[in-house]
Design a protein with these regions (language model features):
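N-terminal low-complexity, acidic/polar interaction/targeting segments
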Residues: 1-134
Length: 134
C-alpha cells in the first residue's frame, strides 16, 4: 500500500474524485496524468496540502456533460510524483492504493467533485498488494 496507508482505516472518509474516461488506476499500479483544467488544478493543490489522495473513476453514459454520472467503482490513488510546468500544468503520478465504491456525492462548494467512498468490499486490496511484494 502506498506510504502511510497500511489499511483502509488509514484512508480518508471523503475524497476528491477525478472522473476521466479511458484512464484506469488499479491498486499497486501507477498512472501518470497531465492536469490542466482549472478545477482539477485546484483539486491537486488541495490534495497536496492534505492527504495527497485523489479518487480516479470512470463515467457512465448518463448525466450532464459537465457533470457526468459516475461509475460504481473507482480507485484511490496517492500523488507520488508532482511537477509544475512553465505553462501552468501539473504533471503528477498517482499510485493506486485501494478500490472503492462511490458512495454519497457531497454537495460542496469546490469546483471539483467529492464522494464518501466505501472501501468495505475491497478492504483486502492493501493486503493483496503487500502479499505480492513479499
Amino acid at each position: 500500500m502506498a506510504a502511510g496507508y497500511r489499511k483502509v482505516t488509514d484512508l480518508p472518509e471523503l475524497i476528491p474524485v477525478f472522473p476521466l474516461d479511458g484512464a484506469l488506476l488499479l491498486p499497486g499500479c501507477q498512472l501518470p496524468l497531465q492536469i490542466f483544467e482549472p478545477r482539477y488544478l485546484n483539486m491537486v493543490d488541495d490534495a497536496m496540502s492534505g492527504h495527497r489522495i485523489i479518487g480516479m473513476i470512470q463515467t457512465t453514459g448518463g448525466g450532464d456533460r459537465t457533470r457526468p454520472s459516475l461509475a460504481e467503482v473507482g480507485c484511490v490513488g496517492r500523488v507520488t510524483a508532482y511537477a509544475e510546468t512553465g505553462d501552468g500544468r501539473y504533471l503528477i503520478t498517482l499510485t493506486g492504493v485501494c478500490r472503492f465504491v462511490a458512495g454519497d456525492e457531497l454537495d460542496i462548494n469546490t469546483p471539483y467533485r467529492q464522494v464518501r467512498p466505501d472501501y468495505g468490499r475491497f478492504a483486502s486490496d492493501p493486503d493483496d498488494e503487500r502479499a505480492q511484494l513479499q
